[in-house]
UniProtKB/Swiss-Prot annotation:
Record-annotated active site: C113 (nucleophile), C210 (cysteine persulfide intermediate)
Family: Belongs to the MnmA/TRMU family.
Gene Ontology BP terms: tRNA wobble position uridine thiolation
Name of this chain's protein: tRNA-specific 2-thiouridylase MnmA
Pfam families: tRNA_Me_trans (PF03054), tRNA_Me_trans_C (PF20258), tRNA_Me_trans_M (PF20259)
CDD domains in UniProt: MnmA_TRMU-like
Amino acids binding ATP: A19, M20, S21, G22, G23, V24, D25, S26, L45, G137
Length: 397
């Protein structure tokens, strides 16, 4: 008989490691599982020292979070451990974050953290502790399929859904992971924390990248990749120099404000050329992208991707975490994979993720995704970049 976590055995005979960040979500997760009778072990990861990250002395800014997690563990009566993962977090997340910005991309460090630190390293630690599952406070869910495997699905609360950040989760990891908050809303989670008497019930959510609490990610990049701060030219789509910039790291695709150049019509950042140290700008219509080339694909749908893709696979994709899934086609091309959007998306930036879903609404299943390598813009009047996805061009006649 399966317990509430879809695991064999009674809760009291089932050890579950909970990744405790010190926030209300993971704290409520730990308290809920403890109340259900599971053998819960809380683990908090010390991932970085903020002072070191920006090259100045100072205490770890995550100290309060560790204190809060420890206080919650004491309150609900579970063992709690703090593990030093700083070196692996720097290698897997911070260094790649700086490399990505220096190459003209806009990275999503939370995806890499989930993929390489939490769901690889911490999951391995949980197994070593004899756990049957690793539970987190993510707003996402999973369900058992007929063959015994598990599917990753969107949270019931779409405003809180974090599936975009978990697309790189593997099938093997999904078998071991559990997400108890997947069917709850944030207000329900806070109320649950109050019922358990947790001190973090009203703790504010973090709004910044965890290792950049000041919001100035350029401080981290400048420390690790000073070449990214070298000045260069701001040019239009025809290559005409319109002005200079202090470093491509200060810009992202779709940006309009802060360009430092005068123009009779609004200009937007279209792309960043790290090799030439150029910021390419143009009209808003040039931001519309139809075709996206992907790298590092992770497929967690049914079967193997090569077997199911055929001449093209119809699905829905999100190119930013804050955007709704849009209809698209996934195709094999040039030894890799491309996405053709039915309707163009603005500001598709290399380094961001393109996540696949089987539906646009409800608790859709996550089919996987990949990182955006490049994108081709929709045809627009003016400029040289009049490129159109071949399939869409044929459809339009």
């Amino acid at each position: 008989m399966l317990n509430s976590l879809d695991l064999e055995g009674r809760p009291q005979d089932t050890r579950v490691v909970v990744a405790m960040s010190g926030g209300v979500d993971s704290s409520a997760t730990a308290a809920l599982l403890k109340a259900q009778g599971y053998d819960v072990v809380g683990i908090t990861l010390q991932l970085y020292d903020h002072g070191e990250a920006i090259h100045r002395k100072g205490a770890c800014c995550a100290g309060q979070d560790i204190h809060d997690a420890r206080a919650v563990a004491e309150r609900i009566g579970i063992p709690h451990y703090v593990l030093d993962y700083e070196s692996r977090f720097r290698e897997s997340v911070i260094d790649s974050f700086a490399d990505s910005y220096a190459s003209g991309e806009t990275p999503v460090p939370c995806i890499e953290c989930n993929r390489s630190v939490k769901f690889r390293d911490l999951l391995a630690t949980a197994r070593e502790l004899g756990a049957s599952a690793l539970a987190t406070g993510h707003y996402v869910s999973s369900r058992r399929l007929d063959d015994g495997s598990r599917a990753l699905v969107c949270a019931a609360d779409r405003d809180r859904d974090q599936s975009y950040f978990l697309f790189a989760t593997t099938r093997e990891q999904l078998q071991f992971l559990r997400f108890p908050l997947g069917d709850m809303t944030k207000p329900q989670t806070r109320e649950l924390a109050r019922q358990f008497g947790l001190s973090v019930a009203d703790k504010h959510d973090s709004q910044d990248i965890c290792f950049v609490p000041t919001g100035r990610y350029t401080d981290v990049v400048e420390r690790l990749k000073p070449n990214a701060m070298e000045p260069g030219d701001i040019v239009d789509v025809d290559g005409r120099v319109l002005g200079q910039h202090p470093g491509i790291v200060h810009f992202t695709v779709g940006q309009r404000r802060g360009l430092g150049i005068a123009s009779r019509s609004p200009l937007y950042v279209l792309r960043l050329d790290a090799a030439q140290r150029q910021v390419v700008v143009g009209p808003r219509e040039a931001l519309l992208m139809d075709r996206i080339v992907l790298r590092d694909i992770n497929w967690i749908g049914d079967g193997s991707l090569d077997d199911v893709i055929g001449d093209g696979l119809e699905l829905f994709v999100r190119v930013r975490s804050t955007r709704a899934p849009q209809p698209a086609w996934l195709r094999a091309a040039n030894g890799g994979y491309e996405v053709e959007l039915v309707v163009g998306e603005e500001g598709v930036s290399p380094g961001q993720a393109c996540v696949f879903y089987d539906a646009a609404e409800g608790q859709a299943r996550v089919l996987g995704g990949g990182f955006i390598k490049s994108a081709a813009p929709r045809r627009f009047e003016g400029g040289r970049e009049q490129i159109e996805a071949p399939a869409l061009a044929a459809a339009r006649g």
